[in-house]
Amino acid sequence: MKTESVGADILLEAHQLVTGPRNNDYGNVVDDYSKVIQIFEGLTGIRMSMSDALLFMVSVKMARLRTNLEKNRLHHDTLADAIGYLGLLNQAYNDLPYPSTVAER
């Protein structure tokens, strides 16, 4: 039987993804996604905000979740990643100096 902790477990897993190895491998989310934004702009000529970049990653994960749900499957890793990207959005917002907002980056 499933327990109520299953929902909380994936939140903890996502937290560990973005604060553990991910943070060690890629560094602070603002620094990491500032590079992503620069590369994307160089390739496309389009300037993304920090929130745009992170929400784009959430969109990628949501599209993959939809594809799997249409096949009556739930891909756990993709779900954890989507939650993690939302956590990174929150972290980026809180890491930016006042009065900057995520949307202004």
Identify the role of each PLM range.
Residues 1-105:
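Intrinsically disordered, low-complexity regulatory regions
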